[in-house]
């Protein structure tokens, strides 16, 4: 089994879409290995977005990501789990995401794009270590 990290962002939780997003992953055969609904603290966000901390947009991103609960998850599946999740999510910009993807079906804007998924196996392990240090 391969695993990846997925985060339903505050907009997904606020809009009542987290369950529908999880169902899409489960319907593709992915299994939830860990999940936690929580408000992300400053340290966790700084670690998760370490490459963005010094960028001009980071304060707005951090404010958005900490404004309400997120659903952090570890999903397990086949060797290409992270790629499967990324394909299901769609493009970063919901406006360019095809129908049938999470962002294409439910997304409204670039920043508030519902979901984050690790972009590689290495990123998945790093992000799992940040959000679920006991795994």
How would you name each of these model-derived features?
Residues 1-135:
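Non-catalytic terminal and connector segments of soluble metabolic enzymes
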């Amino acid at each position: 089994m391969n695993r990846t990290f997925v985060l339903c962002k505050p907009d997904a939780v606020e809009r009542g879409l987290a369950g529908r997003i999880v169902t899409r992953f489960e319907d593709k055969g992915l299994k939830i290995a860990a999940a936690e609904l929580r408000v992300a603290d400053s340290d966790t966000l700084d670690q998760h977005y370490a490459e963005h901390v010094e960028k001009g947009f980071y304060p707005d991103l951090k404010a958005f990501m900490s404004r309400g609960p997120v659903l952090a998850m570890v999903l397990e599946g086949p060797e290409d789990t992270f790629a499967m999740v990324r394909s299901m999510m769609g493009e970063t910009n919901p406006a360019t995401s095809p129908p049938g993807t999470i962002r294409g079906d439910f997304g409204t804007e670039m920043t508030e794009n519902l979901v984050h998924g690790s972009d590689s196996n290495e990123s998945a392990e790093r992000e799992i270590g940040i959000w679920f240090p006991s795994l």
